[in-house]
Amino acid sequence: MRRITHFFGSLFLVELLRGMMLTGRHLFARKVTVQFPEEKTPQSPRFRGLHALRRYPNGEERCIACKLCEAVCPALAITIDSEQRADGTRRTTRYDIDLTKCIFCGFCEESCPVDSIVETRILEYHGEQRGDLIYTKPMLLAIGDKYEAQIAQDRAQDAKYR
């Protein structure tokens, strides 16, 4: 009996019709492709994009040159030099991030005890040469100053999960 059923099923091309029905169902379904430069998907507050260095509200930079971010970076993309100030505190003289090495893992952000280094929602940035993708301390501070409101809002939304 099974052979007869199989014979008539293959004779009338039932499998072919089932496959075409499945294809037709997906043909008229809603498309999931996003045309990226024109359309943008919403980003999470935890999005890991371009790095920024933050300042305190009084204008002083947050980084205390503990070098935890440099130590924890698996790609060795962060370079920090520091020196002692007259008041005994240690501050950075050089803070470079090489974005050609960076894998945007977020370990630097997690290890920072004073919330100095953060990853922003900035996704689109480019460089004409390799050297353009090495971000220095003044560049990172400028990004932090420009996007501080958005960074603070994202940190506040994420605070209950940290």
From Swiss-Prot:
Intracellular or extracellular location(s): Cell inner membrane
This protein's name: NADH-quinone oxidoreductase subunit I
InterPro entries xrefs: 4Fe4S_Fe-S-bd, 4Fe4S_Fe_S_CS, NADH_quinone_OxRdtase_chainI
GO molecular function, one term: iron ion binding
Cofactor note: Binds 2 [4Fe-4S] clusters per subunit.
Reactions accelerated catalytically: a quinone + NADH + 5 H(+)(in) = a quinol + NAD(+) + 4 H(+)(out)
Reported cofactor(s): [4Fe-4S] cluster
Name of the gene: nuoI
Organism of origin: Thiobacillus denitrificans (strain ATCC 25259 / T1)
Protein family (similarity comment): Belongs to the complex I 23 kDa subunit family.
